[in-house]
Regions:
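Active-site anion/phosphate-binding pocket segments in diverse small-molecule metabolic enzymes
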Residues: 2-30, 81-82, 101, 108, ...
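Active-site-proximal beta-alpha core segment in soluble small-molecule metabolic enzymes
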Residues: 3, 16, 20-23, 28-31, ...
Length: 395
């Protein structure tokens, strides 16, 4: 659908949704992809990271836009179920699994031509058996731990033995090797330079001692794309920046311009006037003190992924003005103060994330207010919230 031009004090718009909805701007997705592409070599391709339902933005819809882009190599998911869902929704490009896959998934993984990350010898043996049963090879990416301390072989003699076994295991093809930066989003670049050196040194050992040229080498995550162009290799993995969000406050915001993809809306469903001494929400943590307080109820709460930790300190936007949250955010409802917004009425638009007139509230600002961070907030906007797609080639 076309991008919605929503007037903040109108009581109806042609969205088809009223309680709450997340508007997903595909034009912003494409802008962010092109912006990242401009900061990498022309021969480097991008992996669109679509785990956790595309960081809460809707993986299937974003995947369908990515299918058209020649510079997108494929997708990355965290779980087999996520990867399978992408295939079922029409993904033709390669899909890489970044986490562990349990053996009972291996045959279907082989059938769907999903690339697993490998870092345990038993995985090699069981994937080989699955490849034989399905009658097709399994392309694997070796996970290398250069400083993250989670999954991955180490860049040492034992790791080299693992690569040797992988390249000699029937039915398996070593297509790629990747590592993950632990501190690329921090001002101190030293630890990331160390990780890059460990990766390239191990890759060179593989070339020399095993005479193996791994086709796809990738290190850079979103922060790496921005701050470490020397780590681009063959592929880069675009995660949080794909959605127009920043990896951290320490990452440059001028090298790769970004546009937020998600705007979160609701509507006022009830307004009441309260005199002094009226408690609001659970626990009575807020009590009115003014002669008259105008309280609006919004049908959104932590059951939708809107943080309860915003209780008493967050705000929403109504008619281009900030409306502070009163008391505790409930599971399904939130109350705000609209005493200073006389034009607000039942049905008026509420912006929980996004811009309204001259005011805005970003995912990063919500994170600061709630004591969380933007990755978490985006992923927590759950399936109860409809995603309304606008813009792009399919919108």
């Amino acid at each position: 659908m076309e991008k919605l031009e929503i007037s903040s004090c109108r009581t109806s718009d042609s969205t088809g949704y009223d309680r709450v909805w997340a508007q997903i701007d595909m034009d912003a997705v494409l802008f962010n992809m092109e912006s990242m592409r401009a900061n990498i070599r022309e021969d480097v391709k991008i992996v669109a990271v679509l785990k956790t339902n595309g960081y809460g933005h809707g993986a299937a819809a974003i995947m369908k836009e990515m299918e058209k882009l020649s510079y997108v190599w494929g997708y990355a998911a965290a779980t087999f179920e996520e990867a399978k869902e992408l295939r079922e929704n029409g993904a033709k490009k390669p899909i890489l699994l970044l986490g562990y896959v349990f053996p009972y998934c291996y045959r279907e993984l082989a059938r769907l031509e999903i690339r697993p990350s490998c870092f345990r010898e038993d995985m090699l043996e069981e994937l080989s058996a699955a490849a034989e049963k399905e009658g097709k090879p399994v392309l694997i990416h070796i996970a290398l731990d250069t400083g993250m301390g989670r999954i991955g072989i180490r860049p040492d003699d034992e790791g080299l033995s693992f690569v040797r076994k992988a390249m000699n295991t029937p039915g398996l093809i070593v297509e790629g090797m990747f590592t993950h930066f632990a501190k690329a989003d921090e001002e101190d670049h030293g630890p990331t330079h160390t990780q890059i050196a460990l990766y390239t040194g191990f890759r060179d050992r593989i070339r020399k001692e095993l005479e193996l040229e791994i086709p796809l080498c990738h290190c850079s995550n979103s922060a790496g794309i921005i701050e470490f162009p020397e780590a681009n290799m063959n592929l880069v993995r675009a995660g949080i920046t794909l959605y127009g969000l920043w990896p951290s406050s320490e990452v440059s915001r001028t090298i790769v311009p970004l546009r937020p993809v998600m705007t979160l809306y609701s509507r006022i469903v009830y307004i009441k006037d309260a005199g002094p001494g009226v408690s609001v929400s659970y626990g009575g943590t807020y009590t009115t003190s003014a002669e008259k307080t105008r309280i609006a109820t919004i049908p959104v709460g932590y059951g939708d992924g809107y943080p309860r930790s915003l209780s008493g300190k967050g705000y929403v936007l109504i008619c281009g003005k900030k409306a502070p949250i009163l008391g505790r955010v409930c599971m399904d409802q939130t109350m705000v103060d609209i005493t200073h917004i006389p034009e607000a009425r039942e049905g008026s638009l509420v912006t929980l994330i996004g811009r309204d007139g001259g005011e805005s509230i970003t995912m990063e600002q919500l994170g600061d207010l709630s004591g969380r961070f933007n990755y978490e907030l985006a992923c927590d906007i759950n399936p109860r919230v409809p995603r309304v797609i606008c813009g792009g080639t399919l919108g």
